[in-house]
Amino acid sequence: MAEQVLPQALYLSNMRKAVKIRERTPEDIFKPTNGIIHHFKTMHRYTLEMFRTCQFCPQFREIIHKALIDKNIQASLESQKKLNWCREVRKLVALKTNGDGNCLMHATSQYMWGVQDTDLVLRKALFSTLKETDTRNFKFRWQLESLKSQEFVETGLCYDTRNWNDEWDNLIKMASTDTPMARSGLQYNSLEEIHIFVLCNILRRPIIVISDKMLRSLESGSNFAPLKVGGIYLPLHWPAQECYRYPIVLGYDSHHFVPLVTLKDSGPEIRAVPLVNRDRGRFEDLKVHFLTDPENEMKEKLLKEYLMVIEIPVQGWDHGTTHLINAAKLDEANLPKEINLVDDYFELVQHEYKKWQENSEQGRSEMHAQNPMESSLPQLSLMDVKCETPNCPFFMSVNTQPLCHECSERRQKNQNKLPKLNSKPGPEGLPGMALGASRGEAYEPLAWNPEEPTGGPHSAPPTAPSPFLFSETTAMKCRSPGCPFTLNVQHNGFCERCHNARQLHASHAADHTRHLDPGKCQACLQDVTRTFNGICSTCFKRTTAEASSSLSTSLPPSCHQRSKSDPSQLVRSPSPHSCHRAGNDAPAGCLSQAARTPGDRTGTSKCRKAGCMYFGTPENKGFCTLCFIEYRENKHLVAASGKASPTASRFQNTIPCLGRECGTLGSTMFEGYCQKCFIEAQNQRFHEAKRTEEQLRSSQRRDVPRTTQSTSRPKCARASCKNILACRSEELCMECQHPNPRMGPGAHRGEPAPEDPPKQRCWAPACDHFGNAKCNGYCNECFQFKQMYG
């Protein structure tokens, strides 16, 4: 079995590399003779990262986790909201370490190199530092920390010099490797906070310990005593320029240390660890250990010097609030290939996975041969991809892909009935047309009906999402546009804040399950600025491209087949009802994007269309002017589609939008632009007009003297002509001296000619239309736009 074949530690995958690491580690320690602390030269800069496991099936993934991950500590820290509580940063996993009393060194060594400190290299370096170097600074910091502790403050305990020296000598003995009589029956004595502080100075690298604040009972969960080990340990005995600023992250629970490592290529989250705890309705900074009083006043500065501190947004406790918290950036995997044990373990896992798959397939085939009527454990054949049936909550299987077991059985039943129904020759017996359907109603593709009873789910239960949904590759941002938070699969792809906001808005509607958002495509559920019969331009282009193949099979074109490999679509729950219908049976809500009533927007005067920045009016049914034009256009098309053929509802002679880098379709109603680009162009035109309005007025003022001066010049003698004479000696202008030959025979020079003054361009910049006096020099369109939005 794979459980027995997979090694229980990383170093067991390649013993040669493990030996090479153990040889290099002691050689890298530098021990000065002038009293300076012992320290590593280069090997303290390495960092381990775990490989991805989402490509394996859930059963084999569980085998990997059982071999390498300490599930008890991980679950304990996560349940206490100390680990992985922030969705904006990458998830950390706890690797197993030996519980022999040297777990602090095991965890630190494994975080950097992938091997445990079985040779006691780190423990010997710690002991030699405490014995052979100047430790007065360490002792002074330890005394300050002890005096501030709860034992001294609450009990009023006072130590004299002899007591302090005895306690310090005891701490040095605890770090020794020669401990035949260790406490608690362990091979080595457990270490304390001061040992972590000395260790981070030996490594010249910060250490962050994630731990609970209280020691709790394993049975009742009651508090025993406060825990002080959690917090930040900075290498304060070194200048920040000589330290490695990426911290080592350890977890501590039940008197045991484990390394907390990130997963390689795990998703879009930030590779960082929060420097705060979320507890009791507030964010509390992690404690920075062993600071002197002057250093405590400049704690923020020290953190930014020794760590790469960044700010990340997190959701506040109150609804709609956002907080910026500090987080320390984590290092990525940088082990050289000759000492990288993760790559070797991953190759071994891939090899064992192939063997495990072959054994599983062979076992299923033998079981099916013994009892053909019995299904061969369909749960073991589940894949991490949703069933292709619209709105089906189950996952597809290896044997029934691209459908789940339920939909596959229903399709087989329907196919068995089709030959009987379609036995008639001629048009009535076309495949894909169901007899007994209403006129013009085509055969509907298989869709999930939540009301249909099933005899027990052979697939994954809909109330328990697949572990794949929580894996590292599905970590995506919230579906709400502009929201910086990470989604929660339990909230239908939204973060907690946006989900609560949607719940509040949905409570005002009587039947929100049938409520369609005109700002969303009904096929791919994406937020769009313009829809065509309820679908976005991308899905519309796809349906028109598939029109020929759809007509050949007499099936209605499906709106949009979602990609099976797109993880963002896996976490989005489809609409409770299907919109894939055709003909007269199509509900108006699925074809139109304007099914809302003004009562749904009570308390606000914003436009009814989602994402529109303008305000609506009661005359336009709650829409702004532009959205109301689009609403009337789509409503007219919906009314006409009921009388036309199924293919008549498609738009003909569509043109792409004239906007730059815009892939949507344009509309003649918006001068060839889509609605979004039209609004942007009008806004730009309006701002340019507003910006240059003063310049235009000043130019008009300058033109006034010129016109008054020109009026003093002699005009044409003809009463109907207002032209200015080119020469003072003449009585008629050049136009009257040479009449237009195209004048009709009934016209003569004595008749007054119609006035046709020269036209003037619109005052708005970049406008090709002509202005008029009624609109103050603007064209009708720009003047109306200026009246509406100016």
UniProtKB/Swiss-Prot annotation:
Domain-level remarks: The A20-type zinc fingers mediate the ubiquitin ligase activity. The A20-type zinc finger 4 selectively recognizes 'Lys-63'-linked polyubiquitin. The A20-type zinc finger 4-7 are sufficient to bind polyubiquitin. The OTU domain mediates the deubiquitinase activity.
Phosphoserine, modified sites: 459, 575, 645
Residues annotated for Zn(2+) 2 binding in this entry: 478, 483, 495, 498
Region (Interaction with TNIP1): 369-775
General function of this protein: Ubiquitin-editing enzyme that contains both ubiquitin ligase and deubiquitinase activities. Involved in immune and inflammatory responses signaled by cytokines, such as TNF-alpha and IL-1 beta, or pathogens via Toll-like receptors (TLRs) through terminating NF-kappa-B activity. Essential component of a ubiquitin-editing protein complex, comprising also RNF11, ITCH and TAX1BP1, that ensures the transient nature of inflammatory signaling pathways.
Compositional bias annotation for Polar residues: 566-576
Basic and acidic residues composition bias: residue spans: 689-705
Cleavage (site feature) positions: 439-440
Protein name listed in UniProt: Tumor necrosis factor alpha-induced protein 3
Binding site for Zn(2+) 7: 762, 767, 779, 782
